[in-house]
């Protein structure tokens, strides 16, 4: 069975058992009346069952309802159908004040019907020939308004300075100030120039996100013809059907697929209603994507440490044990489904590098937009500063030093032989984003 954990807030006067049973029925075979066609099938075989309800400590009138769905209710290899069934209708239910899908357990039999990420972590490292450290990226800013040629120039400067990737912002598709084909051509030129000068493989996440699936595939095909290593998709705004199609194309044609989670906070930000991001992340691993943004713990966007590391493990690892302290409600076995690299992005800069390296480990992408392009000397020195900071942190960690306690000292030592890093530290030493996370356990 597919198992689901719902956070249920019943309306006043509705017992939790009734609310849990209503969720199970409405998201499987139930309707509001008994119908004569019920007799033409075996409802016992197909109905969802609410098998456990537990109150949430410290919350009034909130419960975790566990529901089991028979596997035959779902089309093979379709995240779209899985979500339509489990969360399609039930969230507007009048008997509930609020409802949140906290976690899903996907059984091995269903996992095996999905291709999953286009390539996965090990294949990506082999393609890029980069091992033993996190990868570095940068979102090109300003996100809107640059011409294609100026955009390509910014890409070149960042890659030349030492970054592995640059990125289209999720808003950049094909607007009047910069059509997609022009952007693809200038970015490809920047990639090849930077590769020739550095001897390293470089990439730029060219966004294939478009208004129709046909247009999306046209952009992905053009990217492949240019010979670039990676494309990008906004998987929630683009939709799971489009995303799965693109992931299949990427595997067949040797393209890596970077996934942006634009719109996720509309769904996952509220603590008592919606769907937790760990559910969206599991769905993405099934639908397909080699990278996905997962919060930073230390930057400007939402993300508490334990919760973030919980879904980072769900993205990367083959087998994840149940661990309620990190928000993981079920043990999940991904069998041979490739892993996804978590991307830390949003309000981070060189002073965060030790913490990021310690929190996320080697299998991650650390993405600095303003933290590269905001360098007082320009884009290339900004990229140099980030690469020097990363190499210093990785070397210190490999020598057995503790990044959590010695991080500032490690960066300070590196500034002695990198004026670019010294300038970056001077600019960002006062920048902090000190707000409480909304989505806590």
Swiss-Prot record:
Coiled coil: none annotated. Substrate binds at residues 89, 139, 143, 261, 293, 345. Binds 1 Mg(2+) ion per subunit. It catalyses: 2 (2R)-3-phosphoglycerate + 2 H(+) = D-ribulose 1,5-bisphosphate + CO2 + H2O; D-ribulose 1,5-bisphosphate + O2 = 2-phosphoglycolate + (2R)-3-phosphoglycerate + 2 H(+). Signal peptide: none annotated. Its cofactor is Mg(2+). One of its GO terms (biological process) is reductive pentose-phosphate cycle. Its main location: plastid. GO terms for molecular function: magnesium ion binding; monooxygenase activity; ribulose-bisphosphate carboxylase activity. The modification N6-carboxylysine is found at residue 167. It is an enzyme of class 4 (lyase). It is found in: Plastid, Chloroplast. HAMAP family: RuBisCO_L_type1. Heterohexadecamer of 8 large chains and 8 small chains; disulfide-linked. The disulfide link is formed within the large subunit homodimers. Belongs to the RuBisCO large chain family. Type I subfamily. The basic functional RuBisCO is composed of a large chain homodimer in a 'head-to-tail' conformation. In form I RuBisCO this homodimer is arranged in a barrel-like tetramer with the small subunits forming a tetrameric 'cap' on each end of the 'barrel'. This is Ribulose bisphosphate carboxylase large chain. It comes from Coriandrum sativum (Coriander). The gene is rbcL.
